[in-house]
């Protein structure tokens, strides 16, 4: 097998991680709109970098208070939406690892993903996603914590 080595284009500090990206963004431009969320009246509401960081930290603190520890794996069954990004950063801030599971996965596939990863918790988006997970929950003794986005658990 042929191996090719290339020098890094950008030097990365061995002490930095992905959470630093958000902290750096807030330091540089806290009022910059990072996201826009649809409102019930059809309008859109901006979420600034500082607001997003506040939400991330609050959610990360909630995960830690619920017993999530560094290195824990948390499954996520969810379509692409704002809360996914919020969860990504909150899980990283808590030192845990997010295990994405396709929102179209069958109960068998959900079982494999959560079992193979060693997930100890699951976040589902909808009641239907939770129902598919619940079909195999008894076979996943490590998964002791469950949250649902649409139910407002987060």
Predicted regions and their residues:
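Proline-centered helix-kink/hinge sites
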Residues: 30, 79, 98-100
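Conserved AMP-binding/adenylate-forming core of the ANL superfamily
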Residues: 35-89, 106-111
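Structural core segment of the AMP-binding/adenylate-forming
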Residues: 66, 93-154
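Aromatic/hydrophobic pocket-lining residues that form π-stacking "cages" and hydrophobic walls in ligand
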Residues: 22, 87, 133
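Flexible, glycine- and charge-enriched loops at secondary-structure boundaries
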Residues: 11, 45, 49, 100
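A short N-terminal helical cap/helix-turn-helix that marks the beginning
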Residues: 13-35, 54
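Flexible, non-catalytic linker and terminal segments flanking ANL/adenylate-forming cores
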Residues: 1-18, 38
């Amino acid at each position: 097998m042929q191996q090719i080595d290339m020098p890094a284009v950008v030097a990365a500090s061995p002490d930095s991680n992905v959470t630093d990206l958000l902290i750096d963004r807030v330091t540089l431009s806290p009022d910059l709109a990072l996201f826009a969320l649809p409102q019930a009246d059809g309008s859109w509401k901006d979420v600034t970098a500082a607001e997003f960081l506040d939400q991330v930290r609050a959610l990360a603190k909630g995960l830690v208070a619920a017993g999530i520890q560094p290195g824990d794996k948390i499954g996520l069954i969810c379509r692409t939406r704002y809360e996914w990004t919020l969860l990504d950063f909150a899980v990283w801030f808590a030192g845990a690892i997010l295990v994405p599971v396709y929102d179209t996965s069958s109960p068998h596939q959900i079982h494999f993903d959560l079992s193979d990863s060693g997930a100890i918790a699951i976040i589902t988006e909808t009641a239907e996603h939770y129902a598919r997970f619940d079909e195999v929950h008894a076979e996943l003794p490590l998964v002791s914590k469950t949250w649902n986005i649409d139910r407002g658990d987060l």
